Amino acid sequence: MPLAQQIAEWRQQKTLILGILGGQGTGKTTLAAILTEILAEMELQVCRLSIDDLYKTYADRLQLQQFDPRYRWRGPPGTHDVSLGLSVLKQLRQVSPQHPVAVPRFDKSLHQGAGDRIVPERLTAADVVLFEGWFLGVRPIDPALFDHAPSPIISESDRTFARDTNDRLQDYLPLWDELDRLIVLNPVDYRLTLQWRKEAEQMMKATGKPGMSDTEIEEFVQYFWRSLHPELFIPPLLSQPEWVDWIIELDENRLPTSIYCPYNPGLD
C-alpha cells in the first residue's frame, strides 16, 4: 500500500503523528485499522487515537449542556478536553518503557449512549500515532460566510450556533499544530455521509443491536452540519497545501477514485 510506505518514510526515526480527517461514514476508522496492520508488518508500532477519545467526561458534558442546551450531543468543538489531547500527544513523542503513556479511551455505549471515559490504555512504544476525527485539522473561517450559509443552517439561531462553534475551533489549533502530517478523506458529495450513516445503522440493527430511525439519523447528521458545515470548512482546508499532505477522493461507494498531494498533484 503506497500510503503505508509513505508514512514509513515520513517517520524519519521519530514518532510520527498523522492526522486523518473524514466525515461520518467515510471510513477513517477502517483506514486506520488497515494501516495499523500494514505498518505492523513493517515492524512499526502504531497507536490509534480518535478525537472521540478526548471527549470531556459525562459529568462535564452534562454541565456544559446545562449551561448551553445547544450541546445536546457530543461531537462539536467544545465537547472535547483539548488540554488532555495536547498532553497525550506530547507524551507520545517521548514514550518508552521507562516513560509509559496513559492513552485516554472512550466508550460510547455508557450512560444510554451518551458515553464516558473508561480506563486508559497504557502504551510503552509508538512509532506512528494515527489520530483520526471528523473535524481534525479544520480551521476557523470568516464569520461573514455564515450570513449566506447552506442548508441546514437556516435560522438566525442556526447561524449563531455555527458562528459559536467556529469560534471554538480556535481552541483546537494548538492540537492541530501537533500533527506532523494530515490526510483528508474527501467524498465526491458531503451529503453521502448521511446515506452512509443510515447504512451503518441498518447493519447494526440487523445484528440485533439498537439503532436510530432514519428521521433520528437525519436530525443527528444535520446537527453536525450545523456546527461545522463541510461545504464551508473543507474547501478552504484543501486549498492550503501547508495544512494537508494527502487527499483521498471517495466515490458514492466509499472507494478511492484519486489519491494525491495538493502540493504535488502528480504524486499518487
Each PLM stretch: what is its role?
Residues 90-138:
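Phosphate-binding/switch loop-helix module in NTP-utilizing enzymes
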Residues 135-268:
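Conserved NTP phosphate-binding and transfer environment spanning the P-loop NTPase/kinase superfamily
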Residues 13-14, 123-125, 177-178:
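Short loop/turn elements that form and flank the Walker-type P-loop nucleotide-binding site
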Residues 47-50, 54-110:
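Conserved nucleotide-sensing/catalytic segment adjacent to the nucleotide-binding pocket
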Residues 37-47:
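Post-Walker A helix-loop "phosphate-sensing" segment adjacent to the P-loop in P-loop NTPases
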Residues 28:
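Conserved lysine of the Walker
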Residues 1-19, 23:
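Extreme N-terminal, non-catalytic leader segments
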Residues 31, 35:
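Hydrophobic positions on the alpha1 helix immediately C-terminal to the Walker A/P-loop
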